[in-house]
Amino acid sequence: MKFVDEASILVVAGDGGNGCVSFRREKYIPKGGPDGGDGGDGGDVWMEADENLNTLIDYRFEKSFRAERGQNGASRDCTGKRGKDVTIKVPVGTRVIDQGTGETMGDMTKHGQRLLVAKGGWHGLGNTRFKSSVNRTPRQKTNGTPGDKRELLLELMLLADVGMLGMPNAGKSTFIRAVSAAKPKVADYPFTTLVPSLGVVRMDNEKSFVVADIPGLIEGAAEGAGLGIRFLKHLERCRVLLHLIDIDPIDGTDPVENARIIISELEKYSQDLAAKPRWLVFNKIDLLDKAEAEEKAKAIAEALGWEDKYYLISAASGLGVKDLCWDVMTFIIENPVVQDEEAKQPEKVEFMWDDYHRQQLEEIAEEDDEDWDDDWDEDDEEGVEFIYKR
């Protein structure tokens, strides 16, 4: 299936149903009074994370989602039926952004997580709500309010513990094939990897971590060159980045300059991403003698001003890979994910029906009713409107 990590959709919640103007009419009951019911609330639009999905391709074709409108109220104090909700299922890791305001509405990071993206309109009030000791035959009602309407941008961001960085042909895909069951394409030409891929590294029966491989970066990626800048967002949730450096590039390029390009492009894209823990990993050491590889790796690290530990591995032969994976596993265990307070979903605000009803009644009371009479006749405009509605 084609990997699609962005999609734009339109969500429209249902409008609230209108209230009803009606009076009780029964034999031997000359003054039945008002019995118009309230309308129904409009349906909501929800997002739900589903671990069985891994792409947003469905929303390249289906772009509009509308919830059901609430039914109007009816006589005999019958309340209109509430509109049906609409649930949109998205892959785990999807970020929901309101394109109108640029606001991030939420991150869908857990299976089954739900997010309200469009609230249905509130119901209108029937004329029963407006009866009082001085107005026994009210002919007022209120209409339902419109539902929310939003244009949303869905961004799929892979959930991984470890992210792979490097130039094209640095050996990232070979590494992920060596440590996991993932089988990304491997070949001797640049940009073999065209879309991100995930692999689960199992150290034992209880310990494992997820590693993400993205297309290689090249100089000018932040300005749109190559493929990598488009997929750098998939590394934002990673806890540690493995910066793979080809210790002896076959094209004769300078490994130091290649590493500096990666660092520069990271900083241009996001300072937060550039500040993440980054480990230096020299790959393809099997192409050199052990002493030569160690000497060259030391020289590159010094040229980069690297003072932390670095690793020498061969993803193709497996040399040094196991030790690197265990160190990564230890780092992940010692640095658990800290739940960001801002990332928590906002609490659902309950609508205060009493306040809503009081506001509607106050608005009606403010209207001019000097020519009001309690006797209904055919000349009343409200009565004519009511007859046509029935």
Swiss-Prot record:
Subcellular location: Cytoplasm
Gene Ontology MF term list: GTP binding; GTPase activity; magnesium ion binding
This enzyme's EC code(s): 3.6.5.-
Positions that bind GTP: 166-173, 191-195, 213-216, 283-286, 314-316
Biased composition (Polar residues): 129-145
Region described as Disordered: spans on this chain: 127-147
Residue intervals of the Obg domain: 1-159
Keyword hit for GTP-binding: yes
GO BP field: ribosome biogenesis
Signal peptide: none
TM spans (from-to): none
InterPro entries: G_OBG, GTP-bd, GTP-bd_Obg/CgtA, GTP1-OBG_CS, GTP1_OBG_dom, GTP1_OBG_dom_sf, OBG_GTPase, P-loop_NTPase
Ranges of residues in domain OBG-type G: 160-333
Keywords from the named record: Cytoplasm, GTP-binding, Hydrolase, Magnesium, Metal-binding, Nucleotide-binding
Cofactor annotation: Mg(2+)
One GO cellular component term noted in the UniProt record for this chain: cytoplasm
Enzymatic class: hydrolase
PROSITE patterns: G_OBG, GTP1_OBG, OBG
Chain sites annotated for binding Mg(2+): S173, T193
Family from the record: Belongs to the TRAFAC class OBG-HflX-like GTPase superfamily. OBG GTPase family.
Assembly, per entry: Monomer.
Function: An essential GTPase which binds GTP, GDP and possibly (p)ppGpp with moderate affinity, with high nucleotide exchange rates and a fairly low GTP hydrolysis rate. Plays a role in control of the cell cycle, stress response, ribosome biogenesis and in those bacteria that undergo differentiation, in morphogenesis control.
Protein name, entry field: GTPase Obg
